[in-house]
Amino acid sequence: MRSIRSFANDDRHVMVKHSTIYPSPEELEAVQNMVSTVECALKHVSDWLDETNKGTKTEGETEVKKDEAGENYSKDQGGRTLCGVMRIGLVAKGLLIKDDMDLELVLMCKDKPTETLLNTVKDNLPIQIQKLTEEKYQVEQCVNEASIIIRNTKEPTLTLKVILTSPLIRDELEKKDGENVSMKDPPDLLDRQKCLNALASLRHAKWFQARANGLKSCVIVLRILRDLCNRVPTWAPLKGWPLELICEKSIGTCNRPLGAGEALRRVMECLASGILLPGGPGLHDPCERDPTDALSYMTIQQKEDITHSAQHALRLSAFGQIYKVLEMDPLPSSKPFQKYSWSVTDKEGAGSSALKRPFEDGLGDDKDPNKKMKRNLRKILDSKAIDLMNALMRLNQIRPGLQYKLLSQSGPVHAPVFTMSVDVDGTTYEASGPSKKTAKLHVAVKVLQAMGYPTGFDADIECMSSDEKSDNESKNETVSSNSSNNTGNSTTETSSTLEVRTQGPILTASGKNPVMELNEKRRGLKYELISETGGSHDKRFVMEVEVDGQKFRGAGPNKKVAKASAALAALEKLFSGPNAANNKKKKIIPQAKGVVNTAVSAAVQAVRGRGRGTLTRGAFVGAAAAPGYIAPGYGTPYGYSTAAPAYGLPKRMVLLPVMKFPTYPVPHYSFF
């Protein structure tokens, strides 16, 4: 599965292609002017028809019986002869592209549309248009299409089709066979199928506005595919309503918004999977009451050709050649491929390219290997994000467990604005930002400012350093108070005072790590985890170490800090002040058994200068030194060897005699 970032190149190609097929602002303005003018003119035609019908009423029609008048009122309460005009097709869906700008309107009639009504509207429409604008339009009727065709006389050339229809046509077809139609159709009734298609187009436009317009990249992909249908004859049968259904189902079923390139690839994957082929799931028409296949008009050969073409396009896209599918030139890489200019000649004149930058480029200030790290750290410190992040962390330490709430989300999809709030001591603070995280950071800054805490980075560092000083002072007092009593209560108080609230490392007075310094004085110490408390946002660990029979505890936000706190407490108790000299002289030597124990004790006596050590006689133990070495305590005064330095050996180094074990004869075998 390709990662989300790998579709960035496809997105660039799709958006560039989309910009070339999208209508220009002049064309869109011409479309808007023409459609608005015709809609307003049809409204005036409807008013003129109503006035004409009222003027032709006879006096006898006004003297009908009350019951007949009630029936006529119930029949004529629909109102106007022309009920309204609605946009359908590309205008309503926003799918106009260059060289394919078919404009369509539906003129809804109260009664079934007839040829007489069509002629009446056609004759009066130019008169009403002249009252609205000075532009010239050509108006002609098309009885076979049940429509009126309107064309403009200047560039860009546009054609607008106004189709007449009525809801009564569909209601009549949906009646059961047992019901009789009381009214007879007029002889000059317009084509019934054309009127039904106009009603279906109206339903399609409403469905598209409700389902597909809100999907990210859906309209863009539809424009790209409509251009593909115009360029490639194989895709022409899919153009229109089936293509819109496929795109909506393909993109709408994804659990996240898709970019233009990934959305186009997803549509191609659906078509390449064989949904159009016989035996496949088909394509359900959601705008029909009865189960209807939207692909029923296509032949099997057409479906196979489209599937084959989609598979080929999918392969090209997988190999980074989507520009071939879009029939455009490949775009250059967004990142520069070469950072340095390569030299093509060397000193000897042979043609060779330098594939690496010259060594001199790396000299100067970049000699320090940590130069890049320092430069990046400086950039981070100069940014404002560190201030906001520190503010959020400090607020979480001061008031842990605060609940941030999302109040609102406004703005367009490409530039949203989130508003977050938090309740602190009954006061609600609000802030906005381009993301939820940024809005939370802004809220934290407001809360800290209201509480009187500094929010700058330098102020945070000063505050943290003061916390360290106060912690160290409290540690000294607590350790001195716990020296006489080593009970559970005292250790609890010690752990509470040894908590480290800063994120910096814990160091001794000499600038060393407490754990390392304590390990130098007492090796083999074991640290045990006593307790672990707090939630995920505020963990507290308590570590314990035993040194010379005394136990010391330390606490911190993690095990490392708690371990360092415990080691620091032990150092301050045992190796600082008057106890430092006594503890330094202590040497705990592990007891050994048997011959090795005797050798160790003898070596220690020799080092201390208490006389020449003696070795007990034991099996396989000899006092002779190995070649090149002199055993300490044998042949040299005071137990030091001639190879030792003039200033002597370290005080705590344990010197062992060299023991030579007899070697047994090893059999040698030779094979011939």
Curated annotation (Swiss-Prot):
Skewed-composition ranges (Low complexity): 477-497
Coiled coil stretches, renumbered: none
UniProt main location, coarse: cytoplasm
Location in or out of the cell: Cytoplasm
Biased composition (Basic and acidic residues): 357-371, 466-476
GO biological process entries: cell differentiation; spermatogenesis
GO cellular component term of the entry, any: cytoplasm
Molecular-function GO terms, alphabetical: DNA binding; double-stranded RNA binding; single-stranded RNA binding
Entry-annotated residues carrying Asymmetric dimethylarginine: 612, 617
Record domain DZF: where: 5-363
CDD domains: DSRM_STRBP-like_rpt2, DSRM_STRBP_rpt1
Region Disordered, annotated ranges: 52-73, 349-371, 466-499
Keywords, comma-separated and alphabetical: Cytoplasm, Developmental protein, Differentiation, DNA-binding, Methylation, Repeat, RNA-binding, Spermatogenesis
Record-linked InterPro entries: dsRBD_dom, DZF_dom, DZF_dom_C, DZF_dom_N, NT_sf, STRBP_DSRM_1
Domain DRBM: 387-453, 510-576
Subunit structure: Interacts with EIF2AK2. Associates with microtubules; it is unsure whether such interaction is direct or indirect.
Biological role stated in the UniProt entry: Involved in spermatogenesis and sperm function. Plays a role in regulation of cell growth. Binds to double-stranded DNA and RNA. Binds most efficiently to poly(I:C) RNA than to poly(dI:dC) DNA. Binds also to single-stranded poly(G) RNA. Binds non-specifically to the mRNA PRM1 3'-UTR and adenovirus VA RNA.
Name of the protein this chain belongs to: Spermatid perinuclear RNA-binding protein
Protein source organism: Pongo abelii (Sumatran orangutan)
